[in-house]
Amino acid sequence: MALLKSKPTSPGKRGEIRVVHHDIYKGKPHAALVEKLKKTGGRNNQGRITVRHIGGGQRQKYRIIDFKRNKDGILGRVERLEYDPNRTALIALISYKDGEKRYIIAPSNLEVGATIQSGADSPISVGNCLPLKNIPVGTTIHCVEMKPGKGAQMLRSAGCSGQLVAKEGVYATLRLRSGEMRKIHVLCRAVIGEVSNSEHNLRALGKAGAKRWRGIRPTVRGVAMNPVDHPHGGGEGRTSGGRHPVSPWGLPTKGYKTRSNKRTDTFIVRGRKKK
């Protein structure tokens, strides 16, 4: 993995910084693990915009990822590492002894030809998946389940990892990158190591068009709109909004707490660190 700064042959290239992976597979994905992905443009089945700033971009095919890691006791070999346009992390194609192939989120330092396995008896090595009760305290983990058997839901993006800091009764305590300490059931599974492509946050796209290739449309400021479109809109000349910052629907933004799921507050031992 390396950061490549382009020569300033154009204004767009001047600010571009790319993450280059020399060990990545250059061919097409495994056909049996690929599905069609339809563009929505951020619209629902009524044609109304439900998610802003989405539209256009290159076509992608969805790679089916094995988040459950339930092939216990069967050794798998890393056939290749691949780019996945649907996520920030790299993915690895695993070929199992019984002939089945699956994609997984590739951890850092997982090399082509390495062997991985799942199950309670698996050794504590990068890429192996075990229940939390079988992982030693202090281990770095990623792809953590929130309900036993549901599949990984936490710590799946590039460079993400958490640390197992305690085990007490039927719950284990995890420390997340945000500083949050959270209880997870000990039968939930996690993968050893850190998610690959940790330099993803250092890249710079360089130009607006690179965002459009990814299907991301521009974000217009509220003060640049008309009163019908936004609470900050209107006014003669340039204005500063005249009120505390709000969303297009009038809800306070910039620090306003939106979490209302009090039912799961009991599992949060300590909240996120304030920036």
From Swiss-Prot:
Matches recorded under SUPFAM superfamilies: Nucleic acid-binding proteins, Translation proteins SH3-like domain
Entry keywords, A to Z: Ribonucleoprotein, Ribosomal protein, RNA-binding, rRNA-binding
The organism's place on the tree of life at top rank: Bacteria
InterPro entries named in the record: NA-bd_OB-fold (IPR012340), Rib_uL2_dom2 (IPR014722), Ribosomal_uL2 (IPR002171), Ribosomal_uL2_bac/org-type (IPR005880), Ribosomal_uL2_C (IPR022669), Ribosomal_uL2_CS (IPR022671), Ribosomal_uL2_dom3 (IPR014726), Ribosomal_uL2_RNA-bd_dom (IPR022666)
Region (Disordered) location: 223-260
Entry keyword Glycosyltransferase: no
GO cellular component terms, semicolon-separated: large ribosomal subunit
GO BP terms, alphabetized: cytoplasmic translation
MF GO annotations: rRNA binding; structural constituent of ribosome; transferase activity
Coiled-coil boundaries: none
Family matches, as Pfam families: Ribosomal_L2, Ribosomal_L2_C
PANTHER family: LARGE RIBOSOMAL SUBUNIT PROTEIN UL2M, RIBOSOMAL PROTEIN L2
Subunit structure of this chain's protein: Part of the 50S ribosomal subunit. Forms a bridge to the 30S subunit in the 70S ribosome.
Record function comment: One of the primary rRNA binding proteins. Required for association of the 30S and 50S subunits to form the 70S ribosome, for tRNA binding and peptide bond formation. It has been suggested to have peptidyltransferase activity; this is somewhat controversial. Makes several contacts with the 16S rRNA in the 70S ribosome.
Similarity annotation: Belongs to the universal ribosomal protein uL2 family.
HAMAP family noted in UniProt: Ribosomal_uL2_B
Record's protein name: Large ribosomal subunit protein uL2
Encoding gene, per UniProt annotation: rplB
